[in-house]
Amino acid sequence: MRGNIAQLMQQAQKMQENLQRAQEELAKLEVTGTAGGGMVNVTLTGAKECRKVRIDPSILSDQEMAEDLIAAAFNDASNKIDAESKDRMGSATAGMQLPPGMKLPF
């Protein structure tokens, strides 16, 4: 029984280190979302902070379309970050047996 507890503690420590590393990598990540065939680009960090917005001047005359494309580009970047986060967090916990129903990050 002691061996099992010690093994669980080692697994937990390794998982914590892996998660910390994955979170640090995500914080450095920059992802660009696009909309309108590249007419609007929004770049977000892994923490979903907006770094850059590029808008093709040709769409500025149609305010509603510009607003929709900006929102779509932001959502595209946000979805890419979510997918990358899920992938990296999954890799950080690969091979570790988690109790049923337990999801990460905690």
UniProtKB/Swiss-Prot annotation:
**Compositionally biased intervals (Basic and acidic residues):** 80-89
Compartment(s) of residence: Cytoplasm, Nucleoid
Origin superkingdom: Bacteria
- Residue ranges for the region (Disordered) are 80-106
Q: Which GO terms describe its molecular function?
A: DNA binding
Predominant location: cytoplasm
Gene Ontology CC: bacterial nucleoid; cytosol
Q: How far does the signal peptide extend, from start to end residue?
A: none
Keywords on record: Cytoplasm, DNA-binding
Q: Which HAMAP family match?
A: DNA_YbaB_EbfC
Role? Binds to DNA and alters its conformation. May be involved in regulation of gene expression, nucleoid organization and DNA protection.
* Stated family: Belongs to the YbaB/EbfC family.
**What subunit structure does UniProt give?**
Homodimer.
Question: Which protein is depicted?
Answer: Nucleoid-associated protein XOO1065
Tell me what organism the protein belongs to. Xanthomonas oryzae pv. oryzae (strain KACC10331 / KXO85)
